[in-house]
Amino acid sequence: MPSILTDFNVRPYEDVPAQIIELSVPDAAAPKHCPIQLLYWPVEGKSNFIRGYENLKDGLSRLLADVPVLVGRLERGSKGDPRYLAVTISSDASVELEYEDISADDTIASYDDLVRNGFPTTGFKDIVSPKMSLGPMVEGSPMMCAKLNLIKGGAILAYGFSHVLADGWANSELGRLWALHAAHVSQGIGFERQKAATPDDEIRRQLSTLPDFDADAPLDAFLQITPSEEATNFLHKDVLAAEKAKKKAREKMMATLLAAGEVPELPRFTFWRFTPEKLKELKQAATSSDASKWISTMDALAGLFWSRIARIQGQSSNGHQQSRCIFALDIRRRLQQPVPLAYVGNVFSPVDAICPLDELESDSLGLKAAAQSMRQANKGWTQPRWEAWLNKIMSLPLDQTLDTSQEFRLQKHNMYFNDYSAFQLNTASWGAPFGQPARTRCLRSGLAGGAAGVWVCPKFPDGSLEVWLTSTAAIQKSLFEDATFNRYAEFVCQYT
């Protein structure tokens, strides 16, 4: 009988029959990557760590029985078309939950040092990540991967679900379910399905049945037709092909930056914390005196980063008249035929907010203008616009697809915004001995230049939010010195 610390394979708690699950059109349009979450816990003694690992394995086994598609592998569908994808599940399928003791590695900070420094992830990626997550997603890739790491005084769980299977909301729900199953294992509670039943096949057909559209209709300005093999949503046959395409796309991006006079640099990642009191003050400052122009706290938060970064850069004098902020909307409840929140799949729509740069850069108008632009973009979403995006992808020749335009990505006055505040990673308990994570992080790459990226992390139990910014060193330095920004934000940590 193999040791639990050498046998990483986890099989479903109940038998899962061999099957092929055809995915939806929105799944096929999703980026082909596996975002990795990091969960940190303090752990005393290796015996507690091993007990926690056993609970995670048993909890994962129950999760796989609860959501069988997680045990499958990504393939092209029956049509052999890279835009029609499927998950193949074999009768002996399993998922790896790796384990590694890196507590003796002097290059890895101790848990106490991580706490003291705000939980930076410098130098972590290649060491703590599951092996499967370090390469590109290709045909045959698993639907999830996970690894538990023992460090000095603590543990780090690194896991991810394929974006082809799970958008942001579904990713959060899967993490919550795994935590719940692990907690039940630690409490000696027998297996019970925790995922609400959903008619998945019916929902996928619904999401893939798109109305006729005008093939010549103009595209959203932040999209462009691009060679399929260079796009983020293309499924390559193997790692070699994927790496070759990635290298080509990166070389093209670098050449464009250099031609524009930019000096490519390693992106910097900075975390800022906003307390409930500061969030309330920020929303008040971003709210217009016009009662009809209500905004959310998230509109205000996006508006703060968007307006201050624009003011720092002063790009309007260089010929740009407006700025765009791209974000993703979960549209499960906004579709004419709503999709249950428990559905695991992609039901998101890319949206762009637009704001004149002369307003955005204004000390008196910038915050309110940016927040209101975010609100109007949210309110202005329509189902036909989302359907046109998917229809265009499916109607193009096989060697073409839609992707975010390089022009958008490489213009410094634009911004990406991602709201994960509703995720429950910081509040879910994984049972004894781990319990509730002390902190969560997400491993992402950043551009060597161009648009800044803002990620709002899962909310803390006290209502605080951490926000992660990826941008150039010059922007980060200017934000440290920006009185308006620092009125609301508290620095946590920074790394490259």
From Swiss-Prot:
Pfam family, one: Transferase
Active site positions: 163
InterPro entries on file: CAT-like_dom_sf (IPR023213), Plant_Fungal_Acyltransferase (IPR050317)
Gene Ontology molecular function: any one: acyltransferase activity, transferring groups other than amino-acyl groups
Pathway noted in the entry: Secondary metabolite biosynthesis
Main EC class the enzyme belongs to: transferase
Alphabetized UniProt keyword annotations: Acyltransferase, Transferase
Gene3D superfamilies membership: Chloramphenicol acetyltransferase-like domain
Keyword Acyltransferase (UniProt): yes
Ribonucleoprotein keyword on record: no
E.C. code: 2.3.1.-
Known partners and oligomeric status: Monomer.
Summary of the function given for this chain in its UniProt record: Acyltransferase; part of the gene cluster that mediates the biosynthesis of squalestatin S1 (SQS1, also known as zaragozic acid A), a heavily oxidized fungal polyketide that offers potent cholesterol lowering activity by targeting squalene synthase (SS). SQS1 is composed of a 2,8-dioxobicyclic[3.2.1]octane-3,4,5-tricarboxyclic acid core that is connected to two lipophilic polyketide arms.
Similarity comment text for this entry: Belongs to the plant acyltransferase family.
Protein's UniProt name: Acyltransferase M4
Native species: Phoma sp. (strain ATCC 20986 / MF5453)
